């Protein structure tokens, strides 16, 4: 296999047995593809597809005026260019967006002409606000902060059938219901009541009999009965009736008379129940009619109106129950034919017929009025109003839309074959739903499972943005309709009609404050990627935490390969927020799909198909680990498979599909946990969640035991610098990489140079530090998409969230009680867990009523020492070390005139006015913070003079830009002259540039000429002269292009900043804070094994092995068995082997062994102990040496989830590393030198430092803010609150009879206002007495009792 630039420098030993059938797809595709589809940025007018913005415009336009004499049509739209790039937007605190311009056409018709002749057409581009752009990493920059729009998992539109699980009625009877859910519009519910009548609700309002809806649709009673029932036909023959016999319908009935065949043989005796055997005999005998007595039809329901044959008088309406009175009339009138409904109790209930009987309406108008009354109670119904309301509910495209998904799901569910159709409902749709519901009630169908992923779909960014945009457009539409009538008379242009504010506001509201637009988690690359791949069931149109039951949160069989069963938050959101599985993607309808390999008759093919949960249901799917031979045939007699959402076994011939990879079940975060298969699911959940909270350490360290997914995450997260095109590194320093692009990758007209500016010490959303470090050296060759620089938490292009620590599992002096962690001082000395946090502090100078605030170093009443870190503009120097309370930006605010004392008046008279009319409002370093200033940014309003600091910052930025452009020009120019040199050398000159005619051109001749002189050469061949001219034109052109670029950037830098109203100047100071690990910090492994650092011991006191190597961390062995996360033990063993092998390689390098020996040893590691084979023979000797140097600290291993290292392989590795195969060794106590009594498990585990640092949590208070009502101190660090002495603590003091302490706690230390002020004064004076008074909360209690109307007073003795 071919290795990339970084891969061959450090190859991971991979233990996977299964071949890579398919690479893990690009992890951010779900975000980028969705938004790309929404914008359709590069499309021309003809290429626009009917999705996204284009679809939103088409659904609202054309807008036609109320009179119908003017129309506004939509032609197309185009997106402009963003004003600033992403970095500038973050810095300036603005939104990264592009202007949207829409071309619309105003058509005015001639009122006089009868056939709407067009009088006038005006076309114009209208500005419709700004549309935020997605960055290449799938985020949005909104007001300067990076945000992510989380995808939503919601109930798919369509029709769903369900029952109440017997909870509604006390009898426990199942009440069935159907619900038609559109994408937008009113919901329509049908439901049975306990008496088996069908009711309908619109938008969950009052229920009406379902027949009311059918009547409103224009159906008569007879048509309804025809649609739902078959009929029994009786012919009247004197005293008896003759029934047209359908034998199947007699099943289960009791024979009223003997039933005979043609020959008079009795088939069924009178009084016997008719069975399936009897029915077969009847069919054989071919009996078509059956004689029954007249009272056989008593109690049956008529299917058609029964009319007197002579007079035309109605004897019985349809849907009437026949009784003796009606039968007598029938006999008297000599009616020939009676039709009754065929119903029974088993599979054909009389539900619709019963519903019609309780329905009070009798025609369409009454039904419409009834629906109008239900929807608009209290309004007087008119015929037109009722008709309009009903039509708008389900039959108008403006108000109702099933969407393509909804129509597809609807048609499939009611058994239609076509999947396309109208977005609105029709009569047949509603009848079909009712029929299906009645069939289910009759036992001929099953209800739906709403948690099935075939019934839930994912709404991505693009779709949600489109919906919001449409909402804005609908608001615009109303206003435009009003104005269109004026357009006819006043000759307005389209621009005068459209006010884009509502659209811009809707879009801004969605991106700025929607529940699904979230502040991006940016602790480390994994937390970014996971946030973008998150799927939430919450949000607008979704569930709410309180209402979501257990079923919705639970893992469903259809989650397999689509949604991760492990990664979800603990707490109230469990199961409502999920993560996409590693290989999952969405299809055109928004359903999640998972990839499978096609299996044909036991032979596994290379073909891969993506299937949704509905499509996979009928397939028999084998696991990725199913045993195969070399011919790719399944060899087991019975294969473990999934079929119909159940796990079972089948023969290989029945298998139709096979998983592509064992890790397709889990999400990215879970697939980073080695030996996941040995961990309990609850702990794995914690492990995947805690990896997202790891803070990037000072020097990233790759995990010795990984899973092979680390490289994918680092590459796709966008924190590394990836080569856009292949080429040679021209120059590299800490802040930029310049690549001279390979000729075959340069397209005509493009520059053959790529410049990558690295991000240095920038603040992330979580205040951690983003810093990129180059991996390449000058002259290195890189291919496209090679990793050239590491970002935060990445090491040589691999995700590196923590550090490999030497750990021992042993109880040690109680320091690791209850999951505490005992650390060695060496960890602190080597800065293994030192992290850098960057804090942004902002100082704003505003215009106040009394005059403008001023940023200055001239601050009243502040000594010289406090100002020594400020420059003349009053802003702190970059590089200054500052502590709590230091001034960062000097600022003075004018203060109002106060009454002056005589002394102050005297001082003012002597020393002038200035000092007293301003007060000091400088920006100071907050308490508990100490750090280094690493950057200062100054933003000045247009028209306000810029200070020296702002100008110097601007100059340095311009220098950077100029340097980049010069570098680019140098390389382009160099490459052009190289090409010319190779073309000219050895050719003959005609003259020019001081050469004689016929002189041959050599390298020396060219070196003697200045570059400008080359273009004066005249060559004998015309083609060469033409090439010289072209080269000269190209270089002039590039120079001009780069100068334009520079001027553009300069203009941007020099224009004033767009600041909020009333703000004159903003100064942002960035502090870098170094945090070493200390007791109280939270640490964790990757298996959910978390703990708090309890103590940091000197190295010499730590347990050490026989060689004297001390361990770094001591963990409690009791934390393992009960939690069942054995993965950590296996990781520790394999980590020990990895480290041991690294030490062996290190010794070989130090002893300067031959490369062949190194090769042999590396071959043993990579190719002789299980797992994937590595092609080391492809590497040159130098590359082998490079590889060995990078393996000195340990050979990194990959043990992919569900396909990792076996116990035997771990033992073989330990043996190869000359380590004990048990993974245990004898340790000695560092303090006494004594052996511990038994061997201890020692090895290397990957430990993370989590973003729960004691520095951020701990604070102290003496006095501070108090609650307004109770006068008790507030709680929490943010409010600078105190410790709550709660109910239980009071009990404790009561138990000890500590009356005075209790009194102090409840009065002066809490809410006795006078007492505490007095106490404070006393302490200041050195007097420690206290005088407790009345606690304020007691007064509150008295007031509350009075509010109940009880007068209460405290009587003093």
Curated annotation (Swiss-Prot):
Q: Which domain of life is it from?
A: Bacteria
Q: Which InterPro entries match?
A: DNA-dir_RNA_pol_bsu_ext_1_sf, DNA-dir_RNA_pol_bsu_external_1, DNA-dir_RNA_pol_su2, DNA-dir_RNAP_su2_dom, DNA-dir_RNAP_su2_hyb_sf, RNA_pol_bsu_bac, RNA_pol_bsu_CS, RNA_pol_bsu_protrusion
Under catalytic activity, the entry for this protein gives: RNA(n) + a ribonucleoside 5'-triphosphate = RNA(n+1) + diphosphate
Q: Which GO BP terms, alphabetically?
A: DNA-templated transcription
Q: Name one Pfam family in it.
A: RNA_pol_Rpb2_3
Q: What is its EC number?
A: 2.7.7.6
Q: Which Gene3D superfamilies match?
A: 2.40.50.100, 2.40.50.150, 3.90.1100.10, DNA-directed RNA polymerase, beta subunit, external 1 domain, DNA-directed RNA polymerase, subunit 2, domain 6, RNA polymerase alpha subunit dimerisation domain, RNA polymerase Rpb2, domain 2
| Record key words, sorted | DNA-directed RNA polymerase, Nucleotidyltransferase, Transcription, Transferase
Query: Which GO cellular component terms, listed alphabetically, does the Swiss-Prot or TrEMBL entry include?
Result: DNA-directed RNA polymerase complex
Single Gene Ontology MF annotation: DNA binding
Enzyme class, top EC level, equals transferase
What the entry lists under NCBIfam families is as follows: PRK00405.1 (NF001616), rpoB (TIGR02013)
Quaternary structure and interacting proteins, as annotated: The RNAP catalytic core consists of 2 alpha, 1 beta, 1 beta' and 1 omega subunit. When a sigma factor is associated with the core the holoenzyme is formed, which can initiate transcription.
Q: Which family does the similarity line name?
A: Belongs to the RNA polymerase beta chain family.
Q: What does this protein do?
A: DNA-dependent RNA polymerase catalyzes the transcription of DNA into RNA using the four ribonucleoside triphosphates as substrates.
Q: What is the protein's given name? A: DNA-directed RNA polymerase subunit beta
To which species is this protein native?
A: Pseudomonas syringae pv. syringae (strain B728a)
């Amino acid at each position: 296999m071919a290795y990339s630039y970084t891969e061959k420098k450090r190859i991971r030993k991979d233990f996977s047995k299964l071949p890579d059938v398919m690479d893990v797809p690009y992890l951010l595709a779900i975000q980028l593809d969705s938004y790309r589809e929404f914008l359709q940025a590069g499309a021309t007018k003809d290429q626009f597809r009917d999705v996204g913005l284009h679809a939103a415009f088409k659904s609202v336009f054309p807008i036609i005026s109320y009179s119908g004499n003017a129309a506004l049509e939509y032609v197309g739209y185009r997106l402009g260019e963003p004003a600033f790039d992403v970095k500038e937007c973050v810095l300036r605190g603005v939104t990264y967006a592009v202007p949207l311009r829409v071309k619309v056409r105003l058509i005015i018709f001639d009122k006089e002409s009868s056939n709407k002749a067009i009088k006038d057409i005006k076309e114009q581009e209208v500005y419709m606000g700004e549309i935020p752009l997605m960055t290449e990493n799938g985020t949005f920059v909104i007001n300067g902060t990076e945000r992510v729009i989380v995808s939503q998992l919601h109930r798919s539109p369509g029709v769903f059938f369900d029952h109440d699980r017997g909870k509604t009625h006390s009898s426990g009877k199942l009440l069935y219901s159907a619900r038609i859910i559109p994408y937008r519009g009113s919901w329509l519910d049908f439901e049975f009541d306990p008496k088996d009548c069908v009711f309908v609700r619109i938008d969950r309002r009052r229920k009406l009999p379902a027949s009311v809806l059918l009547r409103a649709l224009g159906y008569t009673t007879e048509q309804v009965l025809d649609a739902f029932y078959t009929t029994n036909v009786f012919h009247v023959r004197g005293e008896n009736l003759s029934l047209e016999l359908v034998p199947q319908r007699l099943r289960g009935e009791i024979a009223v008379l003997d039933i005979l065949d043609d020959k008079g043989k009795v088939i069924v005796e009178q009084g016997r129940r008719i069975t399936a055997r009897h029915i077969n005999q009847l069919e054989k005998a071919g009996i078509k009619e059956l004689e029954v007595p007249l009272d056989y039809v008593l109690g049956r329901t008529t299917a058609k109106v029964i009319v007197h044959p002579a007079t035309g008088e109605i004897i019985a309406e349809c849907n009437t129950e026949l009784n003796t009175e009606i039968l007598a009339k029938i006999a008297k009138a000599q009616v020939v034919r009676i039709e009754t409904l065929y119903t029974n109790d088993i599979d054909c209930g009389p539900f619709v017929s019963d519903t019609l009987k309780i329905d009070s309406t009798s025609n369409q108008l009454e039904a419409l009025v009834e629906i109008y009354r239900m929807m608009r109670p209290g309004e007087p119904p008119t015929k037109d109003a009722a008709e309009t309301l009903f039509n708008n509910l389900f039959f108008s495209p403006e108000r109702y839309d099933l969407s393509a998904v909804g129509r597809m799901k609807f048609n499939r569910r009611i058994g239609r074959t076509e999947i396309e159709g109208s977005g609105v409902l029709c009569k047949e749709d509603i009848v079909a739903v009712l029929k299906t519901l009645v069939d289910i009630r009759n036992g001929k169908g099953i209800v739906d499972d709403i948690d099935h992923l075939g019934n839930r779909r994912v709404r991505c960014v693009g779709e949600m943005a489109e919906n919001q945009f449409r909402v804005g457009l609908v608001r615009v539409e109303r206003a435009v309709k009003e104005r269109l009538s004026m357009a006819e008379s006043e000759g307005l242009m389209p621009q005068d009609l459209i006010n884009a504010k509502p659209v811009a506001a809707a879009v801004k509201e969605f991106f700025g404050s929607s529940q699904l637009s979230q502040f991006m988690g940016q602790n480390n690359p994994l937390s970014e990627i996971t946030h973008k791949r998150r799927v939430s069931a919450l949000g607008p149109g979704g569930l709410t935490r309180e209402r979501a039951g257990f079923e919705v949160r639970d893992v469903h069989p259809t989650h397999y390969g689509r949604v991760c069963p492990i990664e979800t938050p603990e707490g109230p959101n469990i199961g409502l927020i999920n993560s996409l599985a590693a290989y999952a993607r969405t299809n055109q309808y928004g359903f999640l799909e998972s990839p499978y390999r096609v299996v044909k008759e036991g032979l596994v093919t290379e073909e891969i198909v993506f299937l949704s949960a509905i499509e996979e249901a009928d397939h028999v799917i084998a696991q990725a680990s199913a045993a195969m031979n070399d011919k790719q045939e399944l060899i087991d007699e019975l294969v473990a498979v999934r079929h119909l959402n159940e796990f079972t076994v089948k023969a290989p011939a029945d298998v139709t599909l096979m998983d592509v990879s064992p890790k397709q079940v889990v999400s990215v975060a879970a697939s980073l946990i080695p030996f996941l298969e040995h961990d309990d699911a609850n702990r794995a959940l914690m492990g995947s969640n805690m990896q997202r909270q790891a803070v990037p350490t000072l020097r990233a360290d790759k995990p010795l035991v990984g899973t092979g997914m680390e490289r994918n995450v680092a590459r796709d997260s966008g924190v590394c610098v990836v080569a856009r095109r292949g080429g040679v590194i021209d120059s590299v320093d800490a802040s930029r990489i310049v690549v001279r692009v390979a000729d075959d990758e340069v397209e005509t007209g493009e520059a053959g140079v790529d410049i990558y500016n690295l991000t240095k010490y920038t603040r992330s959303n979580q205040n951690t530090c983003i810093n990129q470090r180059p991996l390449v050296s000058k002259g290195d060759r890189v291919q496209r998409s090679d990793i050239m620089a590491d970002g935060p938490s990445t090491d040589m292009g691999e995700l590196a969230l923590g550090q490999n620590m030497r750990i021992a599992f042993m109880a040690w002096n109680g320091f690791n009680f209850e999951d505490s962690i005992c650390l060695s001082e060496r960890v602190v000395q080597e800065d293994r867990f030192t992290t850098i946090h960057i804090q942004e502090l902002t100082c704003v100078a505003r215009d106040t009523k009394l005059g403008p605030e001023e940023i200055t170093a001239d601050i009243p009443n502040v000594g010289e020492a406090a100002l020594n870190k400020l420059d003349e503009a009053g802003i702190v120097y970059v590089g200054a070390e500052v502590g709590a309370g230091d001034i960062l930006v000097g600022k003075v605010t004018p203060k109002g005139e106060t009454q002056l004392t005589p002394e102050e008046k005297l001082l003012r008279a002597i020393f002038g006015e200035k000092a007293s009319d301003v007060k000091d409002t400088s920006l100071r370093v907050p308490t508990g913070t100490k750090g280094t200033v690493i950057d200062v940014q100054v933003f000045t309003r247009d028209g306000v003079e810029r200070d020296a600091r702002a100008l110097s910052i601007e100059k340095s930025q311009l220098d950077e830009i100029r340097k980049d452009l010069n570098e680019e020009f140098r390389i382009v120019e160099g490459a052009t002259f190289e090409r010319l040199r190779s073309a000219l050398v050895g050719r003959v000159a005609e003259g020019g540039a001081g050469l004689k005619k016929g002189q041959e051109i050599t390298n020396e001749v060219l070196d003697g000429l200045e570059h400008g002189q080359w273009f004066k050469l005249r060559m004998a061949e015309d083609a060469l002269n033409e090439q010289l001219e072209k080269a000269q034109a190209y270089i002039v052109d590039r120079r001009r292009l780069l100068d334009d670029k520079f001027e553009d950037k300069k203009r941007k830098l020099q224009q004033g900043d767009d600041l909020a109203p009333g703000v004159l100047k903003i100064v942002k100071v960035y502090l870098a804070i170094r945090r070493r690990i200390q007791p109280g910090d939270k640490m964790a492994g990757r298996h959910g094994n978390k703990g708090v650092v309890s103590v940091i011991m000197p190295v010499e006191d730590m347990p050490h092995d026989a060689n004297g190597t001390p361990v770094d961390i001591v963990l409690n062995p009791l934390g393992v068995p009960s939690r069942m996360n054995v993965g950590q033990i296996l990781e520790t063993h394999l980590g020990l082997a990895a480290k041991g092998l690294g030490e062996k390689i290190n010794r070989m390098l130090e002893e300067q062994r031959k490369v062949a020996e190194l090769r042999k040893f590396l071959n043993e590691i990579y190719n002789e102990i299980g797992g994937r084979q590595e092609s080391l023979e492809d590497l040159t000797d130098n590359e082998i040496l490079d590889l060995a140097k990078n393996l000195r600290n340990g050979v990194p291993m990959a043990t992919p989830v569900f396909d990792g290292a076996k116990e035997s392989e771990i033992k073989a590795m330990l043996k190869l590393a000359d380590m004990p195969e048990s993974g245990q060794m004898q340790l000695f106590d560092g303090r006494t030198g004594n052996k511990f009594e038994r061997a201890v498990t020692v090895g290397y585990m990957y430990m993370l430092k989590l973003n729960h640092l004691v520095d951020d949590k701990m604070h102290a208070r003496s006095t501070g803010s108090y609650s307004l009502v109770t006068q008790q101190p507030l709680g929490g660090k943010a409010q600078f609150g105190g410790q709550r002495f709660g109910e239980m603590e009071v009990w404790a003091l009561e138990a000890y009879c500590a009356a005075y302490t209790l009194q102090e706690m409840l009065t002066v230390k809490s809410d006795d206002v006078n007492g505490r002020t007095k106490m404070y004064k006393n302490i200041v004076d050195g007097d420690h007495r206290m005088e407790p008074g009345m606690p304020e909360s007691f007064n509150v209690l008295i007031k509350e009792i009075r509010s109940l109307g009880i007068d209460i007073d405290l009587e003093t003795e």
